[in-house]
């Protein structure tokens, strides 16, 4: 497939506001992609590598701007590109605004055709670029990018620039790709037509939707296990549902972590009768893989390879386990007395690439495994939680401190006592899990509940925001929050404490944009400064010290609750209150 065709189809998808129509357009693109299908399935999400692969292009905005400037001609600098970015708001629009070398040459001679880029070429060049390292690698990357941009027309440049910076954002999420793969290769054309036909009778449409949902479920199962949209798209086309059903876990290829909702013991017991209760550690999620050759790999919650940062965990697993396994758990920081240290301490170790040996002496970490997804050739995702935990215990031993305790209880008082013990030991709280539930990668359903002590919310002033992308480009989306600093003069100042984008529906985004847009004082690209006037009530899991924000604090996992229409900026929470809450944690 020519990259120009990919760009044209991506532009068509970006311009389409209707979700079903987007799926249809994407389905057509997949059907026409030929041998490039796996690559196209990744490109539409702004990916060059599969979701499970933590390899990155390692290209910062400045390097991309330099490449665009070089392709645009000798009179254009990276600073010029950044000036246009401030005016136009996103890198794709900036790249599309220049006439690059190849296009200038064609215009000058008025004849002939430049060899167009193909999707395969772009993929190959970007993969080679990602592999560049060591002395001179930055210049190598710059030359590669220059060579690509120099062969693009404006539409191609728009989507190449976005792809390079992983900012494709054409309104295509993982669910959209899943549905489009199903529609392209598994759903009968007659069923797809019946679903879209307003005149189809109800029975025909219902039957078509049921078959479509079954096809989508088959794609979803394969994606849960593989985390590779390109591979799954190819299997769906070439082997159908039978091929998808054959996808299995692969040691060394991480899957998305199963996630939890907030909940209570009453919720758990009311739903399941008996709950599996575990300690909720104040650590970092980690997925442990040991292959048949004894090699151990560790992956973060975001599937980033963190093996080199945690050598003591690697050593423990290598010595404790003989068979290929995939485990889920957390790594926790411990003091010399075996007491847990705060989350900030584990961050000093997690993802560290340098001075690992020195930091190992300063911050000791240990594994706390709570699930087993694969053991000795057996995929265990479909097994009940209780059975998976039994397999985990058999692997690591009944008395191993690396195995998280599991209490099966239908007694609220017993669960409350377990929670009190966990809190007294310095942990975050407890997890409540359905003992009969399978492991569902990437799912934040009702089978796992996190129960932590209630924390207060904060009423914070909105002092900035960012415009969204794609179909959300007309809405403000990420909001900068500030705490009030009381001044003797009576003219309060505001110090930043974090950003919130979680817990806000599309309808609320529209309402918040209408509320805040009149208060915009300055715009620079996507970022806007907002006059302190609107107060958000914000929930959070913890207040942390942080140099990132001017207050010296940051909210861990902030979430939007509501607009405090009864409050003004002058009556919002003060930085003094933030400090008191932080001290009381």
Curated annotation (Swiss-Prot):
Its cofactor is Mg(2+). Keywords: ATP-binding, Cell cycle, Cell division, DNA damage, DNA recombination, DNA repair, DNA replication, Ligase, Magnesium, Metal-binding, Nucleotide-binding. Its EC number is 6.5.1.1. It is an enzyme of class 6 (ligase). The active site is at residue 280. Gene3D superfamilies: DNA ligase, ATP-dependent, N-terminal domain, DNA ligase/mRNA capping enzyme, Nucleic acid-binding proteins. DNA ligase that seals nicks in double-stranded DNA during DNA replication, DNA recombination and DNA repair. PANTHER family: DNA LIGASE, DNA LIGASE 1/3 FAMILY MEMBER. This is DNA ligase. The lineage of its organism: Archaea, Methanobacteriati, Methanobacteriota, Stenosarchaea group, Halobacteria.
């Amino acid at each position: 497939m020519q990259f120009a065709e990919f760009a044209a189809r991506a532009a068509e998808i970006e311009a389409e506001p209707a979700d079903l129509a987007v799926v249809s357009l994407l389905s057509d693109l997949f059907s026409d992609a030929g041998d490039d299908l796996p690559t196209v399935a990744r490109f539409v999400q702004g990916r060059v590598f599969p979701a499970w692969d933590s390899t990155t292009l390692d290209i910062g905005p400045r390097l991309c701007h330099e490449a665009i400037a070089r392709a645009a001609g000798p009179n254009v600098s990276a600073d010029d590109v950044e000036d246009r970015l401030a005016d136009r708001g996103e890198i794709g629009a900036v790249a599309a605004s220049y006439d690059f070398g190849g296009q200038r040459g064609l215009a000058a001679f008025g004849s002939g055709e430049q060899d167009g880029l193909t999707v395969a070429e772009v993929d190959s060049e970007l993969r080679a670029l990602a592999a560049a390292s060591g002395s001179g690698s930055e210049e190598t990357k710059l030359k590669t990018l220059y060579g690509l941009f120099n062969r693009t027309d404006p539409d191609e440049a728009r989507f190449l620039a976005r792809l390079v910076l992983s900012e494709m954002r054409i309104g295509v999420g993982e669910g959209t790709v899943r549905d489009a793969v199903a529609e392209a290769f598994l759903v009968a054309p007659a069923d797809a037509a019946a679903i879209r036909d307003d005149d189809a009778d109800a029975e025909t449409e219902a039957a078509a939707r049921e078959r479509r949902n079954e096809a989508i479920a088959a794609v979803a199962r394969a994606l849960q296990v593989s985390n590779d949209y390109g591979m799954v798209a190819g299997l769906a086309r070439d082997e159908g549902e039978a091929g998808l059903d054959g996808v299995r876990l692969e040691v060394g290829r991480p899957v998305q972590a199963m996630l939890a909702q907030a909940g209570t013991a009453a919720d758990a017991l009311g739903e399941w009768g008996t709950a599996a209760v575990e300690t909720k550690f104040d650590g970092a999620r980690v997925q442990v893989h040991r292959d048949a050759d004894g090699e151990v790999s560790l992956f973060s919650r975001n599937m980033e390879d963190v093996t080199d940062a945690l050598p003591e965990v690697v050593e423990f697993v290598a010595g404790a386990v003989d068979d290929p396994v995939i485990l889920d758990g957390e790594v926790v920081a411990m003091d010399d007395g075996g007491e847990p240290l705060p989350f900030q301490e584990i961050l000093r170790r997690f993802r560290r690439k340098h001075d690992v040996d020195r930091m190992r002496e300063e911050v000791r970490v240990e594994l706390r495994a709570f699930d087993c997804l694969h053991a000795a050739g057996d995929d265990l995702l479909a097994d009940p939680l209780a059975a998976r935990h039994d397999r985990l215990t058999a692997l690591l031993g009944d008395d191993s401190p690396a195995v998280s305790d599991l209490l099966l209880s239908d007694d609220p008082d017993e669960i409350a006592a377990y929670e009190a013990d966990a809190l007294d030991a310095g942990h975050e709280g407890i997890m409540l899990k359905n003992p009969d539930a399978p492991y569902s990668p990437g799912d934040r359903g009702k089978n796992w509940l996190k129960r932590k002590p209630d924390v207060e919310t904060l009423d914070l002033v909105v002092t900035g925001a960012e415009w969204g992308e794609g179909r959300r480009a007309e809405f403000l989306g990420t909001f900068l929050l500030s705490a009030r600093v009381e001044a003797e003069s009576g003219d309060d100042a505001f110090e930043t404490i974090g950003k919130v984008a979680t817990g806000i529906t599309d309808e609320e985004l529209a309402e918040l944009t209408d509320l805040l847009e009149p208060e915009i004082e300055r715009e620079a690209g996507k970022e806007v400064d907002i006059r302190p006037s609107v107060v958000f009530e914000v929930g959070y899991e913890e207040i942390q010290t942080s140099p990132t924000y001017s207050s010296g604090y940051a909210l861990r996992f902030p979430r939007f609750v509501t607009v405090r229409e009864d409050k003004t900026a002058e009556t919002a929470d003060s930085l003094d209150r933030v400090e008191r809450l932080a001290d009381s944690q």
